[in-house]
Amino acid sequence: MESTETWVNGEFLNGKVDRMDGTDKYVRIVDYKTGAIDDSAVAYYTGRKIQMELYMSELKGERIPAGVFYFPASVSYKENEEGRFRMQGFMNGSEEAVLCGDTTLSKDNPKVTSEFFPSALKNSPNTTRVMEEETFRDFVDYSVHVARQGCQELKEGFIAATPYEGKCGSCKYGGMCGFNKESCTPRKENTIDTTAIAEIARKKKELRQMQITVELRDL
C-alpha cells in the first residue's frame, strides 16, 4: 500500500493506494474493489470519480502514467471465470507501456489482447479507454483541475446540494442534506469521451501557465 499527499489550492490532501507497479519509466496504480465499479469517463468528467487519477498525478513524479485501474476483487464463485483477472480503467496505449504492463504480450502477435487490461499492441478493442501517451497524461491531469476547482468553491462558501440525476436514491446523507427533489432539479450527466476530457485539461493547463507568466512578469 502506497501513501500519497499533495497540496491543492492551499489545501492538504492525503490518501493511500492499494497497489502501485512501476519501472524506471512507467507507473500504474491499482485499486481493489469488492463492490460495483463505476469507471466511466462521465463519472470522471463530473468529478464523482477522480481519486485514482488524482493519486497518479502526485505519485508519478517524473515517470510516465501507464494506467489507472480498478481490480474486481470479488470472492463469489462463477461458472465461467473467463476474464476474472481483467482490470477496469484507463491506460496509456503506447507500445512500450503496454509491453511493460503485460510481459506475456509479444510484437510477433500485436493484435492479441491482454488478459489483464483492455489493450493489444495494435487495434486495441476499446479505444475509449486506451489513449495515446500524451493524451493519457492530459487525461490524468484533469483530476487536479477538478480538485482545484472544488477547493476554491468550498473556500468561497459554496456548499449547496447539487446532486446528479439518479444519485439521491443510494445516498446515505439524504435525510440531512436539504435537497428537495420536488422543487429542485438534479443535474444531468452528459456523454463525453476521454479525448475531450484530455483536451479540456490541456487547455486549462495552458491557460494556467499563461496566468503564472503574467503574474511573474508583473512582480
Predicted features and spans:
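Structural signature of nuclease core domains in nucleic-acid processing machines
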Residues: 1-219
